[in-house]
Amino acid sequence: MPIILGIDPGSRITGYGVISEKKNQLIYLGSGCIRTLDNGLPHKLKLIYAGVTEIISQFRPDFFCIEQVFMSKNADSALKLGQARGVAIVAAANQNLPVFEYAARQVKQTVVGNGAADKKQVQHMVRYLLKLPSAPNTDAADALAIAITHSHLYAFHAH
């Protein structure tokens, strides 16, 4: 029963979602957000690294999946997002986890069936696919969607 950790990186809020799969059934294990205060970028990156490390220790995932950086019109935002991704990936690498990256359009296409889906559609489908009593917040839903994408695509390519 492989455990998959999905990460939706951000310099202010990093979402995480943990799922497993048993007999082609998705199983929700946990989700949430790592929130960083406005104490400067180095401190934020430290909190993201520590938070991801703690989540890895708690859930012991077999796979680490993260959203790829998209090109942004705001270079500063793209750089901060890249740095947040980097420290999350280092946390996974320090635990010898295999790292998989998925584009946002690919995640939306896999989970919703539409690569241009909005956040509400992603939340709805994540809730439906994981049989959750309520929709997770958008950052956690995006992270769970990344994990679901890995579950579908990795299983497809493994056979």
Curated annotation (Swiss-Prot):
GO molecular function annotations of the record: crossover junction DNA endonuclease activity; DNA binding; magnesium ion binding
CDD domains the record matches: RuvC
Cofactor(s) the protein requires to work: Mg(2+)
Catalytic function, reaction form: Endonucleolytic cleavage at a junction such as a reciprocal single-stranded crossover between two homologous DNA duplexes (Holliday junction)
First-listed, main subcellular location of the protein, grouped into a coarse class: cytoplasm
Subunit structure: Homodimer which binds Holliday junction (HJ) DNA. The HJ becomes 2-fold symmetrical on binding to RuvC with unstacked arms; it has a different conformation from HJ DNA in complex with RuvA. In the full resolvosome a probable DNA-RuvA(4)-RuvB(12)-RuvC(2) complex forms which resolves the HJ.
Transmembrane region(s): none
Keywords: Cytoplasm, DNA damage, DNA recombination, DNA repair, DNA-binding, Endonuclease, Hydrolase, Magnesium, Metal-binding, Nuclease
Signal peptide (UniProt feature, chain positions): none
Keyword Hydrolase part of the UniProt annotation: yes
GO cellular component: cytoplasm; Holliday junction resolvase complex
InterPro entries noted in UniProt: RNaseH-like_sf (IPR012337), RNaseH_sf (IPR036397), X-over_junc_endoDNase_Mg_BS (IPR020563), X-over_junc_endoDNase_RuvC (IPR002176)
Family that this chain belongs to: Belongs to the RuvC family.
PANTHER family the UniProt entry points to: CROSSOVER JUNCTION ENDODEOXYRIBONUCLEASE RUVC
Pfam family, one: RuvC
Matches recorded under HAMAP family: RuvC (MF_00034)
Residues involved in Mg(2+) 2 binding: E67
Residues that bind Mg(2+) 1: D8, D139
EC top class named in words: hydrolase
Protein name: Crossover junction endodeoxyribonuclease RuvC
EC code: 3.1.21.10
